[in-house]
Amino acid sequence: MEKYQSKARFAPLSDAPFALRGALGSSNSSFNNIDHLRQSSSSGQARSYTSSPLGALRPKMFPSGNRLLHTSRPLSAPVANRPLSPHLPLKKPQLSATFSISHRIFGAALGAVIISIPLATKFSLMFDV
């Protein structure tokens, strides 16, 4: 057992938890030792992480001033500099709230008329009206 712990490859893993030994022990892992993992987790900053196929976690590196957005084209300067919030849309809605509500009411009324014509025909033939 001691001949395995004397190898340089397993030296940084002596105090690592068992679950991390496989990810940290690979030669192409992004963490060279367990101290880097402790420093990155104790920094107190919220970071995003990617995972490699081997299970090692690496912090995503974004250029300063840029953020990850799911858009197909570049944003204008005022939109790009505004902080992201889940309750603020990036663009103004195209339809006003009044138009949207009236559209729903008209759709419900039209649906009721379309359904009532076959029902009225069926019941008029059934009761000879």
Swiss-Prot record:
Keywords carried by this UniProt record: Electron transport, Heme, Iron, Membrane, Metal-binding, Mitochondrion, Mitochondrion inner membrane, Transit peptide, Transmembrane, Transmembrane helix, Transport, Tricarboxylic acid cycle
Keyword Zinc-finger: no
Needed co-factor(s): heme
Membrane topology, as annotated: Single-pass membrane protein
GO cellular component, as recorded: mitochondrial inner membrane; respiratory chain complex II (succinate dehydrogenase)
UniProt cross-references to Pfam families, sorted A to Z: Sdh_cyt (PF01127)
Domain of life of the organism encoding this protein: Eukaryota
Principal cellular location given in the protein's record: mitochondrion
Chain spans, region Disordered: 27-66
Binding residue positions for heme: 87
InterPro entries named in the record: SQR/QFR_C/D (IPR034804), Succ_DH_cytb556 (IPR014314), SuccDH_FuR_B_TM-su (IPR000701)
Subunit (UniProt): Component of complex II composed of eight subunits in plants: four classical SDH subunits SDH1, SDH2, SDH3 and SDH4 (a flavoprotein (FP), an iron-sulfur protein (IP), and a cytochrome b composed of a large and a small subunit.), as well as four subunits unknown in mitochondria from bacteria and heterotrophic eukaryotes.
Its job: Membrane-anchoring subunit of succinate dehydrogenase (SDH).
The protein, known as: Succinate dehydrogenase subunit 3-2, mitochondrial
Gene that produces this protein: SDH3-2
